[in-house]
Amino acid sequence: MAREIALDHVRNIGIMAHIDAGKTTVTERILYYTGRSHKIGEVHEGAATMDWMEQEQERGITITSAATTCFWKEHRINIIDTPGHVDFTIEVERSLRVLDGAVAVFCGVAGVQPQSETVWRQADRYGVPRLAFVNKMDRMGADFNKAVQTMKDRLKARAIPAQYPIGAEEDLRGMVDLITRKAYIFNDESLGAEFEVLDCPEDIEAEVEEAREALLEAALEQDDTLMEKYLEGEEITIAEFKSCMRRAVISSAFVPVFCGSAFKNKGVQLLLDAVVDYFPSPSDTPYIEGLLPDSEEAAVRKPSDEEPFAALAFKIMTDPFVGTLTFVRVYSGVMESGTSVLNASKDRKERIGRLMLMHANKREDIKEVRAGDICAVVGLKNTTTGETLCDPNKPIILEKMDFPAPVIAIAVEPKTKADQERMGVALQRLAQEDPSFRVEVDHETNQTIISGMGELHLEIIVDRMMREFKVDANVGQPQVAYRETITQMVEHESKFVRQSGGRGQFGHVWLRLEPNEPGAGYEFVDGIKGGVVPKEYIPAVKNGVGEAMANGVYVGFPMVDVKVTLFDGSYHEVDSSEMAFKIAGSMGLKEGAMKAKPVLLEPIMDVEVETPEDYMGDVMGDMNSRRGQIQGMEDSGNNRLVKAQVPLSGMFGYATDLRSMSQGRATFTMQFGHYAQVPKSIAEEIKAKTTG
């Protein structure tokens, strides 16, 4: 079967933005104008086509990046809708990995908002070419030039207008295309589907010419010959101008800025034209790099149907009708339904079931996908996010995505026995869909602990458990894994004797307990000389000591970093047994440890906060109130990086507090550093709470 659309007519794009910049509305309008959606869905009515999970429709925020295919001017555009909330940056990471270009949507009133900075940094990391769209130009206080300036100041982006707005706020009528100098005036009656193309209005001609010169000079940096032609006073044609613009966008030399109001249906068609004109097609990337699974040598695949098949799974979703959907981006070759491919990341074969093109939550079955396509596959059993599917005879592993470690954990308990069984299945499914969400069972408390990227993230997980899997669960407070240790050396004698007629019990040991190096754990040393305790009983002593340590002596938390030496003792020919020595060892540890000045230890986290200078004082003051110790500060771009060590117990609710403290502009990472002694007054409080 021949290719339906030439590879150079394919565009894989994402739409990224801050939470309220109007990203979903922009996507909706694109679907409307490209004929994919017959009725425009408004987000604030809870009806947008892309926001198709129930939680999204209620909250009016986009959580899951749905992939949609549409057509514009004989080009196929695959759109990945990305979430704009800090807790969902994992989704943004995933979608950026498989895009060839991204439209960054900004609010005409607020300009660059906090999450835009985070997403922009992620796009920089993956080297994604960008266009910017300043939306909401019809709103009170909208200012195109100010919005462009915030992109320069906050994102350090080389943002250059490619359009000039005609009118502002409620008088916004359209915009001038700086390349052609034509004015586009939109007709409100036809929902903006019809517009007039006129000459540039005279009252803004001077501003338009000045802006056009700036754009032209930046574009011509891509071509020395054309630059010379321009400097010699010759006219640059529109085709030459556009070709330089395209090269500039693909090489990320600068970011052209467009404007409009998606809600008022102005400017979206011109944005689509820009996507087609300036963004790269898959064939503009010379090749994609990967590794050979056996030798880890570098290997490449060119974006061509003739190359061996290679694709990356970038998202997994559970669909109520067809089961698991795996979204893949095909980089090379052809994949047909009904064939077998290799999951090179796991070295397992996978059978390809149905292949589908997705339109938000409507779908179309297809027989095959080719290089450059994005589609959903039904029925993959072993493939998770970030893994490579490829030709079994030509294996390759494409780059693996890095996912951040979760920063918050809570315990969940099913309300009934029936919920218990369903909860296991639900959590396993959700963890498979989302690599930034982890599930583990705490062996000490037997609780199921779920951890993720923030409180909203876990709220939505619990919400989905209820809606999709009908699991009712109680959600606990976040818990800290405390530990105990000793602070001085002690020698202690322990004797376990039971004589009650017949065979008795006899075990007698001398133990030396010493504090061990932090992090060294429990160490047992056999120091018996001359067989005073027979060899066969020594493992029993070790087990008894180990069990007592697991249960703790001071508050009841497991003990760590203790060195225990068995150095003396005695036995009875008849009455001694493994059980007697195990009990003697256990008693010896408990009694000895209480004399060795036991203390409580708590996990100390290494925390890094990246914050704009304005919030530095608040962040530092807040750190101190959490018993944090500032380790150092450094510059990070136009932000400041604060490094601190903070007890985990002080970090609960931090994501939410930091967000409100910095209006969402500060970000933080946190990972386990080491255990340290809890101050005595706090240890006593914990003891009182725990032992009741």
UniProtKB/Swiss-Prot annotation:
One of its GO terms (cellular component) is cytoplasm. It is found in: Cytoplasm. It comes from the Bacteria. Residues 8-283 form the tr-type G domain. Its main location: cytoplasm. CDD domains: EF-G (cd01886), EFG_III (cd16262), EFG_mtEFG1_IV (cd01434), EFG_mtEFG_C (cd03713), EFG_mtEFG_II (cd04088). GTP binds at residues 17-24, 81-85, 135-138. Keywords: Cytoplasm, Elongation factor, GTP-binding, Nucleotide-binding, Protein biosynthesis. GO terms for molecular function: GTP binding; GTPase activity; translation elongation factor activity. GO terms for biological process: ribosome disassembly. Belongs to the TRAFAC class translation factor GTPase superfamily. Classic translation factor GTPase family. EF-G/EF-2 subfamily. HAMAP family: EF_G_EF_2_B. PANTHER family: RIBOSOME-RELEASING FACTOR 2, MITOCHONDRIAL, TRANSLATION ELONGATION FACTOR G-RELATED. Catalyzes the GTP-dependent ribosomal translocation step during translation elongation. During this step, the ribosome changes from the pre-translocational (PRE) to the post-translocational (POST) state as the newly formed A-site-bound peptidyl-tRNA and P-site-bound deacylated tRNA move to the P and E sites, respectively. Catalyzes the coordinated movement of the two tRNA molecules, the mRNA and conformational changes in the ribosome. This is Elongation factor G.
